[in-house]
Amino acid sequence: MAQITFKQEPITLLGSQVKTGETAPEFTLLDNDLNEVNLSTYDGQKKLISVVPSIDTGVCDQQTRKFNEEASQEDGVVLTVSVDLPFAQKRWCASNGLDNVITLSDHKDLSFGKNYGVVMEELRLLARSVFVLDKNNKVVYSEIVSEGTDFPDFESALEAYRNI
């Protein structure tokens, strides 16, 4: 188990961290209409998976906007994952006029968080992280932000995404 901090407090991450070069593990998430979505839903597409603790916070909001603005110009898909309820994710998208943002919820069973090693045990939230997968689901970039209130390395993640 790895440790990070959140607001400078130590946090334990559950699960096995996904590393560059590995095949990404499967997951089951809920979309905004409560439909189950799996990694295989996006087979044949490159993927930028942006993981945030809660979509309604300032840093998470900015992270979601930045990745969608920058990466949506590429051929692929950008997924934002949090444990927010699908209704809250849908409301956030609607209130911000962002119809093209794909938000997915891991609130049901934390399968994504456990499989990717990003469940913050003490908070039952997901650690801020970014995973870039090629069309065959090979992990080409993986970052778990060491302080949960900091931004990820946008440029490195976007460069990895563009270079697929």
From Swiss-Prot:
Family, according to the entry, reads as follows: Belongs to the peroxiredoxin family. Tpx subfamily.
Q: Which UniProt keywords apply?
A: Antioxidant, Disulfide bond, Oxidoreductase, Peroxidase, Redox-active center
Main function: Thiol-specific peroxidase that catalyzes the reduction of hydrogen peroxide and organic hydroperoxides to water and alcohols, respectively. Plays a role in cell protection against oxidative stress by detoxifying peroxides.
The further comment given in this record reads: The active site is a conserved redox-active cysteine residue, the peroxidatic cysteine (C(P)), which makes the nucleophilic attack on the peroxide substrate. The peroxide oxidizes the C(P)-SH to cysteine sulfenic acid (C(P)-SOH), which then reacts with another cysteine residue, the resolving cysteine (C(R)), to form a disulfide bridge. The disulfide is subsequently reduced by an appropriate electron donor to complete the catalytic cycle. In this atypical 2-Cys peroxiredoxin, C(R) is present in the same subunit to form an intramolecular disulfide.
Q: Which residues form the Thioredoxin domain?
A: 18-163
Q: List the disulfide bonds.
A: 60-93
A single Gene Ontology MF term assigned here is: thioredoxin peroxidase activity
How the protein assembles, per its UniProt entry? Homodimer.
PANTHER family per record: THIOL PEROXIDASE (PTHR43110:SF1)
Query: What protein name does the entry list?
Result: Thiol peroxidase
Q: Which Pfam families match?
A: Redoxin
Active-site positions on this chain: 60
Give the EC number(s) under which this enzyme is classified: 1.11.1.24
Catalysed reaction per UniProt? a hydroperoxide + [thioredoxin]-dithiol = an alcohol + [thioredoxin]-disulfide + H2O
